Amino acid sequence: MLGDGNEGISTIPGFNQIQFEGFCRFIDQGLTEELYKFPKIEDTDQEIEFQLFVETYQLVEPLIKERDAVYESLTYSSELYVSAGLIWKNSRDMQEQTIFIGNIPLMNSLGTSIVNGIYRIVINQILQSPGIYYRSELDHNGISVYTGTIISDWGGRSELEIDRKARIWARVSRKQKISILVLSSAMGLNLREILENVCYPEIFLSFLNDKERKKIGSKENSILEFYQQFACVGGDPVFSESLCKELQKKFFQQRCELGRIGRRNMNRKLNLDIPQNNTFLLPRDILAAADHLIGLKFGMGALDDMNHLKNKRIRSVADLLQDQFGLALVRLENVVRGTICGAIRHKLIPTPQNLVTSPPLTTTYESFFGLHPLSQVLDRTNPLTQIVHGRKLSYLGPGGLTGRTASFRIRDIHPSHYGRICPIDTSEGINVGLIGSLSIHARIGHWGSLESPFYEISERSTGVRMLYLSPGSDEYYMVAAGNSLALNRDIQEEQVVPARYRQEFLTIAWEQVHLRSIFPFQYFSIGASLIPFIEHNDANRALMSSNMQRQAVPLSRSEKCIVGTGLERQAALDSGALAIAEREGRIVYTNTDKILLAGNGDILSIPLVIYQRSNKNTCMHQKLRVPRGKCIKKGQILADGAATVGGELALGKNVLVAYIPWEGYNFEDAVLITERLVYEDIYTSFHIRKYEIHTHVTSQGPEKVTNEIPHLEAHLLRNLDKKGIVMLGSWVETGDILVGKLTPQVVKESSYAPEDRLLRAILGIQVSTSKETCLKLPIGGRGRVIDVRWIQKRGGSSYNPETIRVYISQKREIKVGDKVAGRHGNKGIISKILPRQDMPYLQDGRSVDMVFNPLGVPSRMNVGQIFECSLGLAGSLLDRHYRIAPFDERYEQEASRKLVFSELYEASKQTANPWVFEPEYPGKSRIFDGRTGNPFEQPVIIGKPYILKLIHQVDDKIHGRSSGHYALVTQQPLRGRAKQGGQRVGEMEVWALEGFGVAHILQEMLTYKSDHIRARQEVLGTTIIGGTIPNPEDAPESFRLLVRELRSLALELNHFLVSEKNFQINRKEA
């Protein structure tokens, strides 16, 4: 795959490695760093001192398993214990205890966390790196104005400006600016020190008048001047300690803390040698920045490209978790300080355990995972989705951009993205370009930068050495592009290669090349790398394909693709969908839910995932691949997961497709399919829905789960057991009771029905005072009950003691309205399901499975689907599978076409079917109309592409309403499927009906069917007795609402009723 002459062997890194490395960095370094920052806490009399001993902290292994945490809605976390000491200064006694600080959510083998039973993942964020950046803008006179922006670690910004007279100003707010001399003086320098530390002292002296000298005469004067401009305070403020503290808090802490990365960037940009541990902005930094700004004014130095990746940093999982840990420790410090003071006040003897409570840390992390924009619910539609979600990069989030304000330049592809951020895989819509995906080989470096690997080409060494370079480093090298991998050094013409140098693309001699790419997939994300023949597709269609593969539903019988790229096995392995042997041994027992592996003198039980629900309601299930008694090795696959076959990703099916218009049924991307796909369960998928109900303890008593529900029909309760919960294996329909529940309530004597009062008076029967609050199966939920769980929360309050969950499995065949897609952005909706005898058929009598519109190919420019289609046909006839790396034209011109035609020709010879490859129209064939038996006029492309069924299914979207709830104010039906809402007849619909003159239908839609309260009540009665519907005389509710709104604007509006007989006008009050 990497060529013959100059290849090196490299393995693709684990796709979850980014998440693992981030979490390990947090556990190893982040925890310790934040714990060391925890201060020593003293009481008000300074007699007692509390401190933490960081060296002895420990994390305890969780007591519960991951699967139990999901089912019981718990957090899979580890308890953090730290040694703490309480020192009495008078007696010099110390009490030391190991204290429990709180729970830290752990990361599992998929790179995700389980919080309150939900899989959550933390997204990496791209931020502007702290440091100084220079740019130039034109003012209103067309003159270039140079500015230097200092960005702190907190995201705060300060600007240095240089005006026409070469005076330098520091902008402290949008409107206020002060002289650089005042700022330097306020930071502690006098005039002599300032002039000694700058390269252009004469420029600084040129704008030093008497007024300026007075301002910087002393540090106090400078601070007062600075405070006056920064806080916009009028009058004459007085210098004080509190004024300095306020300035320190509001300005210097937020805008002058550079951090570790900012200090490194500042030193490199301004040629400084300030130690790395000095993370605050110093006067020396300000003066060096001013010198650089003066140099730019006179044509020395270069401006910065703010969108270059060398000026960005990645805020990884480690940084986000460390920030939250620091926040939790600040809250813990406040709690300890308050507890010490309270204990002294009440003359109690405190101990370290009594002073520290766990809620600050636990609640901080729970709120972070639940509310932070970068913590998202893991998308688990299929195995590919899980991996891709963890490799996302977002410009959005706290301290970042927003979809409304981000410019086109930020969203656009930048040359520095090469090999680091995928140029194809991004969101569609308002977030396009703001949410990207990591390239396959990219990694996050020590300084928060994205690094990409290259092979070093050296004449001195014959071996191949791999380098990881940060975004700024590779600009100094000549980097050969991917098509140099198969370079033949013996041919003189091929010694000129395309290369990249300083963001430009050149053609240079091979001897001048310093580095070369290591892999054809190096530039792309996982989703884009799974598209065969991607080089023949338009990038917009490749983007749609990489997004739609994540929406593919796992099918009941998966099938691996005939034409792939070779990355399917790695994607399946890293997804966690497969069961893999952790050690070698022999299989001694197999079952649907577990495998027993014997080895090293003991037996290991490996549990399998059986009918597990994902958060997109798809079915996660593992199927055995190894027989009983077989000896296996470590790392061998024991069971396939959902959407995997033989350890490879299998998201769809290879089906026989013809590209031909058919009676308009495939107009505008509609798709025609055969009934074989339904009857043989080709595109059948299982979906699992979860329904839950809680039992509370009310003021009238506890709610009761029972099967004795009064006033309900018996057939609705037929599936309940003695406890009142639906039985496993039951088939349930819409409206059936899943859990019977009664809620006690106080009922007044007057509210009893007459028959209830009669029973109480004559027979003395006590009528039930409970209200029925059962869990009923909503519309569209019919299916088979596969699991029931009655969960009591550990340590839960009596307010919400129990939860009952019912899991129902649905079998969904493909039907009209479902969405299908290929791997090249070719998507469509099923428009009709034809009998197989009516479908077009091939010369060997086989009917095609799908009919696509050929007009969807040329305008979309996704020709890769044609290559895949024809090669898939050859592969199915020859019983071969192809794994083709992209950009195979690097070997020779028209390599893809030659491969496809040669395989079709071989298939034609081996199967003795000349129609497979006809030289007059290669790749096409004469096919016949199934209805008439006549051949179509033109030869047609037929083949076997890989087609996916997507999560956008008609069962989840189609909706109808006969009756339902109404809005309180307008009395119109609610909106939306979830609320059993109705359709709105808007302006354009009214115009359409007016155009056809259907006055009575229009009146019905605007009155009876909408918001006329009295009229819609009369409709029910007249429908039952078979009478005629009366004409409504008064106004509908929305008209009455409009009248009242106009009255609030002092406008009176009335309507009148004109009699048909005598034309009398009767005024009606709205």
Swiss-Prot record:
Any GO BP: DNA-templated transcription
Pfam families in alphabetical order: RNA_pol_Rpb2_2, RNA_pol_Rpb2_3, RNA_pol_Rpb2_6, RNA_pol_Rpb2_7
Molecular function GO labels: DNA binding; DNA-directed RNA polymerase activity; ribonucleoside binding
Keyword check for Cell membrane: no
Localization per record: Plastid, Chloroplast
UniProt-listed Enzyme Commission number(s): 2.7.7.6
Keyword Ribosomal protein (UniProt): no
Reactions mediated catalytically: RNA(n) + a ribonucleoside 5'-triphosphate = RNA(n+1) + diphosphate
Quaternary structure and interacting proteins, as annotated: In plastids the minimal PEP RNA polymerase catalytic core is composed of four subunits: alpha, beta, beta', and beta''. When a (nuclear-encoded) sigma factor is associated with the core the holoenzyme is formed, which can initiate transcription.
Membership in a protein family: Belongs to the RNA polymerase beta chain family.
Name of the protein in question: DNA-directed RNA polymerase subunit beta
Name of the encoding gene: rpoB
